[in-house]
Each structure stands twice: as C-alpha cells, then as structure tokens.
Amino acid sequence: MSIETNLIAGTTVGSPTIIYTSSGDSAVTSMFFCNTDSNDIDVTVFIVPSGQTLGDEHTIMKTLSISTTDTFAFGSERILLGNGDTIQAFASTTNKVSAVISYTGI
C-alpha cells in the first residue's frame, strides 16, 4: 500500500491539480480531502483515462463543499486505474485542501 499527498493548487479559473498518476495498473483504496482553511471550500474531482482530455464525463465529485477544518473521506469502493490514468482536482481556494490518496499496485 502506498500514499500520495498533494495540496490542490488548481482553481476553476485555471488548470486542475493532478493529485495522482497511476504507474502501471493500480487500485485506489481511499481518498481524503482535508480543508485546512478557516472558510468552507468547494472541491471537484475527476478521473481522467490516459490519453483523454479532462471533461465533464470524468467528474466523480462536483463542487463538494468541505467545511472549515473538516475532512471528506471517499473510500466505499475501490477505483481501478490503468497506466497513466490520473486523478485531478479543482478547489475554490488555492493550496488549502490537502489530498491524500491511498493506493496499491495490481
């Protein structure tokens, strides 16, 4: 099992932050999004297959509001990714949401 951590720098007016890139086939076991700010923050998350351009069809969470200093856990199902697939995210405030991805190679 491995862990990937990032701050979400991308906002809806710029490019999303790539918070995980699959190296080979992998299974994402859980994702945590922690709001470290003193205000609520909206987060949108996408899973983009290798070679594709980000689009609405890749959305897995849309404008999810995370309360001040709260954490949202996403982990009820495993997400299987192929080599080069990415998890990308936008946040309404730059560098205030910590994204932690737990995954394993398969």
Give the positions of each predicted feature.
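A generic short-segment signal for beta-strand/edge and adjacent turn/coil regions
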Residues: 1-2, 11-16, 31-33, 56-58, ...
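Extended low-complexity, serine/threonine- and proline-enriched intrinsically disordered segments
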Residues: 45-47
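Short solvent-exposed strand-capping/beta-turn motif centered on an Asx-Ser/Thr pair
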Residues: 33-38, 92
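A generic structural signal for short beta-strands and their flanking turns/coil linkers
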Residues: 27-29, 39-41, 62, 70, ...
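C-terminal interaction-tip segments
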Residues: 1-26, 30, 49-51, 84, ...
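Intrinsically disordered, low-complexity Pro/Gly/Ser/Thr-rich segments with frequent PxxP/GP/PP motifs
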Residues: 50-86
